[in-house]
Amino acid sequence: MEQDNKHPLVAIKCFVYNHEPYLRDCLEGFVIQQTDFPFVAIVHDDASTDKSADIIREYATKYPDIIKPIYETENQYSKSDGSLGRVMNSAIDATGAKYVAMCEGDDYWTAPRKLQKQVDLLEADMSLMAVVTDTSVVDNMGNVLTAKRGGVVKDDIEGKYTLRDFFGTPQHAYPTASVMYRNVHAQEIRRMLAHTANGYLGNWTLWIVLHTFGDFYYLNQVTTAYRINPTSVTHTCDRIGRAKAHRTICNAVADILPSQYADISEDLRHTDWVWVSLMFAYKHEHYYFHMLGAMCMALIKCPKTLFHNISQGLRRRMNKNAQV
């Protein structure tokens, strides 16, 4: 593979905030990678109040060619003005990397050749925008809860998947730590994401936006571990707030989708958020009345999609309960 030695081929985005108990696992997952190309990890500590920054300094000293730290003295996420994303975007741009990988500070990689396998796939097929893999699920202590989560794509079949396929997946999401995407159309992607910016939904909107530029390849291998962390942003947000945010974000995503996805936009406006809202608000009975009108509209506009989404959600809920 021809490589410009002035720039790493891959840049890893790693956001850290009070991840001290888990951070070594995360950073070890970076430095064990076996590749025939250079890569860097932009590790951004958002003014942690624990010893996360000390751990990052330790690894940056030991692996200066890989670990590229950013230390904040003021928490950027709490500003809610996009500062956190802008800092990371500037750092990624400065690397000149061709591909971007992702891993939050409380998750970690388990496969030493994860990056190499993903790069090989992207280099071989220019129609691909990203490569995603499966993940295991662990608890706060690192105990494996699920060896292979599954459901990343329909029937776990390895291959290429479109945006339409994404909306038909059982999980309706990709494991963040498993994703590597092509670093192209950066300004257009950021403009689209700015229109849909919302902290409740993690990278859900990013997957959708990336899909509008190309297919995802699903590599049917476990390369990462997703940690169930009750102190993470998505676990600490109140259910009512998340339900309302999901409706807002579905409408925003519908606004930015290209015209060939008009049917998906219609589904997003009238059905997709309904099931998620029901799940987020299931302990708040009064919120159901707030959604009755929208439910009726969804039944009129997109009955098949509504019933499909609800049946998929019920199936996921039953499978999750069966594993407990």
Question: For each predicted feature, which ranges?
Answer:
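Acidic helix N-cap motif at the loop->helix transition within catalytic regions
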Residues: 22-24, 50-59
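Short aromatic/hydrophobic "clamp" motif used to bind/position activated sugar donors
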Residues: 100
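A conserved acidic beta->alpha catalytic loop
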Residues: 45-54, 74-75, 104
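Cell-envelope/extracellular polymer assembly enzymes that use nucleotide-activated donors
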Residues: 8-11, 40, 205
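Conserved nucleotide-sugar donor-binding catalytic segment
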Residues: 85, 93, 133, 151-239, ...
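Conserved donor NDP-sugar-binding/catalytic core segment of glycosyltransferases
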Residues: 113-147
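Glycine-rich, basic loop-to-helix element that forms the pyrophosphate-binding segment
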Residues: 73-95, 117
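Short, acidic, metal-binding catalytic loop of nucleotide-sugar glycosyltransferases
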Residues: 28-38
